[in-house]
């Protein structure tokens, strides 16, 4: 099948590789442009860009498709059977959605209509969902509102982080989109009920609100690993909490309760087990406390 592939982050790479391995003719790969990253502002290509070049595929990196008439004309002229989209990072204009003979097919990391939007994996963990999954969807002009072609659920374990689920869902999405392209799956409109949204996250979401329940804070730590992370303030400096576990005790939210760094939350307490100071490597909490003792009664945040 003659395809375009549109994706940017690591989540999309397994699908690109699976389509290529299955023998589909991928005539163009669209992804976000290279951007400066880190303190040195070195130009960095996104994971899909690097994977596509390794496969010898043509890469297109338009900055804004909606404003790029020439790029949209190029896309329409590709004579595509379908376009496969996976976390591309841009909204596709209407003329592109209908250009391929089978339209544009999206790999979405949730069981639609639950968690439409930019951060469905994070949202599922934050909500305490027992499961999530992947939906292969026929795209329309709405935000993840298109008809469902195929979906499969994945359980969320009590210790699963965003990265754990990301890897499993990426592999599942690759397998499901191959099935859809090779088979005949009639589109099923999404139900009107059960719609929830997963908005885009920002660095501001990293700050821990210690007045929240221990369960909510633990879910945030799992959901926001590695980005945007979860952090608090200790002695005026940022302290990232990368892993944590439930702990006994109660107190004023944000207060250190014992010499092993149990921290009071809105209803109970948590104990960080892996932390990171600004500019330092991550370390076990025990090692951190040996070099940086924290007195009982210290307030964080």
Swiss-Prot record:
GO (cellular component) term, any one: cytosol
Reaction(s) catalysed by this chain's protein: L-methionyl-tRNA(fMet) + (6R)-10-formyltetrahydrofolate = N-formyl-L-methionyl-tRNA(fMet) + (6S)-5,6,7,8-tetrahydrofolate + H(+)
Highest taxon of the lineage: Bacteria
Record: residues binding (6S)-5,6,7,8-tetrahydrofolate: 110-113
Protein name per its UniProtKB record: Methionyl-tRNA formyltransferase
Organism the protein comes from: Acidiphilium cryptum (strain JF-5)
Functional description taken from the UniProt entry: Attaches a formyl group to the free amino group of methionyl-tRNA(fMet). The formyl group appears to play a dual role in the initiator identity of N-formylmethionyl-tRNA by promoting its recognition by IF2 and preventing the misappropriation of this tRNA by the elongation apparatus.
InterPro entries in UniProt: Fmt, Formyl_trans_C, Formyl_transf_N, Formyl_transf_N_sf, Formyl_transferase-like_C_sf, GART_AS, Met-tRNA-FMT_C, Met-tRNA-FMT_N
First-tier enzyme category under EC: transferase
Keyword Protein biosynthesis carried by entry: yes
Enzyme Commission code(s) on record: 2.1.2.9
NCBIfam families per UniProt: fmt (TIGR00460)
Any one Gene Ontology molecular-function term assigned to this protein's record: methionyl-tRNA formyltransferase activity
Homology family: Belongs to the Fmt family.
Lineage of origin: Bacteria, Pseudomonadati, Pseudomonadota, Alphaproteobacteria, Acetobacterales
Keyword terms of this UniProt record: Protein biosynthesis, Transferase
HAMAP family linked to this entry: Formyl_trans (MF_00182)
């Amino acid at each position: 099948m003659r395809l375009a592939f549109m994706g940017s982050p690591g989540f999309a790479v397994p699908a690109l590789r699976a389509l290529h391995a299955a023998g589909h003719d991928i005539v163009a790969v669209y992804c976000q442009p290279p951007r400066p990253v880190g303190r040195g502002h070195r130009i960095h290509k996104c994971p899909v860009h690097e994977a596509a070049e390794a496969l010898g595929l043509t890469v297109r990196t338009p900055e804004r498709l909606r404003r790029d008439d020439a790029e949209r004309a190029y896309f329409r002229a590709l004579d595509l059977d379908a376009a496969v989209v996976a976390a591309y990072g841009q909204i596709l204009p209407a003329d592109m959605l209908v250009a391929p003979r089978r339209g544009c097919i999206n790999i979405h990391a949730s069981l639609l209509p639950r968690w439409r939007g930019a951060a469905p994996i994070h949202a599922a963990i934050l909500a305490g969902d027992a499961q999530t999954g992947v939906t292969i969807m026929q795209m329309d002009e709405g935000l993840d509102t298109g008809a469902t072609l195929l979906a499969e659920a994945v359980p969320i374990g009590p210790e699963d982080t965003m990265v754990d689920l990301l890897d499993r869902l990426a592999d599942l999405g690759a397998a499901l989109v191959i099935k859809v392209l090779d088979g005949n799956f009639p589109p099923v409109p999404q139900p009107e009920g059960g719609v929830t949204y997963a908005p885009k996250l920002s660095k501001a979401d990293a700050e821990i609100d210690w007045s929240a329940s221990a369960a909510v804070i633990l879910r945030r730590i799992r959901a926001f690993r590695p980005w945007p992370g979860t952090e608090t303030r200790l002695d005026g400096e940022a302290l990232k909490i990368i892993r944590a576990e439930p702990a006994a005790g109660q107190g004023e939210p944000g207060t250190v309760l014992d010499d092993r760094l149990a921290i009071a939350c809105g209803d109970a307490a948590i104990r960080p087990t892996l932390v990171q100071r600004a500019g330092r490597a991550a370390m076990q909490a025990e090692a951190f406390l040996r070099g940086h003792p924290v007195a009982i009664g210290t307030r964080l945040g």
